[in-house]
Amino acid sequence: MAVTAWYEAQLTVLHVFSASLPLIPADALAAAPELADPIEPDKMLDEVRRFCVPSLSTLTRPAEFLVKDGNVPHEIVAEAKQLAVDLIVMGTHARKGIQRLLLGSVAERVLRTAHLPVLAVPPAERTAPITYERILCPIEFHESEPRALEYVLSMVLPFMKGVSPRSKKPGARLILLHVVENLFEQLPEYFSVHEREAMERLKRAVPADARDWCRPEPRVTAGRADTEILRVAAELGSDLIVMAVHGKGAINRRLYRSTTSRVIRGATCPVLTLCAE
């Protein structure tokens, strides 16, 4: 809601369900016949409205509500394309067991096919107003990342604490993280050179005018990408992780998206993914 309110954007709330009857044992149906009742979209739409209304008080434009029957990731992407949306927001409410794996599967399929920014939001651990004081932005030095970083700055910085579209105040931290693979970590002389070069590139990544908005902090670590991203995010108490999903080849895309999926599943703060292709 914070993003929608700041930009006075149109919010569309989408709920996807499957009307097909699952395989339920006959004795279970006999004990709970309501399981066989057909789903009524109008009633479900009313339920969605009632569920969401308490969270919509900050909106300047009335929200639109949609209920669709079908495959969850397919319907999400199809509606996003139909409505020409700028951002998809998904809640990662399932934190354990099979539900967590299923949620990861849905999120990964949306990331793979949406080709637009996706914000994955975990269960709320605080009720205070949302501010972005510490943003973690992993950088892989891909040729498309300057555009992704520009997008991050234009979209996220207006929501940082003490910053508004009309009043820029410095203070928020933008942590630029580059993770060096384990191979270099095991070769100290190579890691030292790579670390030095990476630090210089990170320092040059943020445009000069953006430094009036935030405090860029370059950081280089060694290890597996998703593990290091989650570790640094937890260490800093990050309010947001921003990742570019890129790679020209199919293998590169799969590798980076698998990293992104693991970060989404393990993060305790929202994760914004940007399609930088």
Label every model-predicted segment:
Residues 28-32, 82-83, 106-107, 136-138, ...:
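Short, hinge-like loop/turn segments at secondary-structure boundaries
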Residues 1, 53, 108, 150, ...:
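Active-site phosphate/pyrophosphate- and oxyanion-stabilizing loops and adjacent acidic/basic residues
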Residues 75, 148-151, 201, 228:
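Well-ordered alpha-helical segments embedded in enzymatic catalytic cores
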Residues 31-46, 190-200:
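A short acidic, glycine-rich active-site loop
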Residues 2-8, 12, 18-21, 36-39, ...:
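Structural beta-alpha unit
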Residues 1-33, 133-193, 208-211, 215-219, ...:
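Small/aliphatic-rich secondary-structure junction motif
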Residues 6, 77-128, 231-277:
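Gly/Ser-rich helix-loop-strand patches that form or flank binding pockets
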